[in-house]
């Protein structure tokens, strides 16, 4: 909401969270959104992979996700998903309700000298720390 109010374009880098990321970046409590039963059910109803639903949800919210893939069929599916078969308001609300502020890419590899852990990279409470 803040970004929209100030004309800032929201870009979702790695919007699926890279469930297949390296072991060094995984934590036991991590949950990949594409594995959530509610998201899988919505994906099944649309006949697509749960990752496509995540991209569709981001675009319908006004964000510009940047999904990664090495496969041409996924690029095509990602492009088609934002122009066809929109999510219903009920589906949008269901997905919104799943938010647990979970990050699969926490940024361990981006920590600077002196940083304690990945929490130093994020404004988890909405307060920017300088």
Residue ranges and their predicted role:
Residues 1-130:
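Beta/alpha (TIM)-barrel catalytic core signal, keyed to glycine-rich beta->alpha loops juxtaposed to Asp/Glu
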């Amino acid at each position: 909401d803040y970004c929209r109010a100030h004309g800032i374009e929201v870009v979702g880098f790695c919007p699926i969270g890279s469930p297949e990321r390296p072991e060094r970046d995984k934590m036991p409590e991590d949950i990949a959104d594409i594995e959530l039963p509610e998201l899988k059910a919505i994906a099944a109803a649309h006949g697509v992979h749960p990752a496509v639903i995540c991209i569709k949800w981001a675009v319908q919210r006004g964000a510009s996700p940047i999904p990664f893939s090495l496969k041409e069929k996924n690029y095509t599916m990602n492009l088609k998903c934002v122009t066809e078969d929109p999510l219903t308001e009920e589906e949008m609300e269901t997905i919104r309700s799943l938010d647990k502020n979970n990050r699969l890419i926490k940024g361990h590899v981006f920590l600077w000298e002196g940083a304690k852990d990945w929490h130093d990279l994020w404004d988890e409470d909405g307060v920017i720390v300088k």
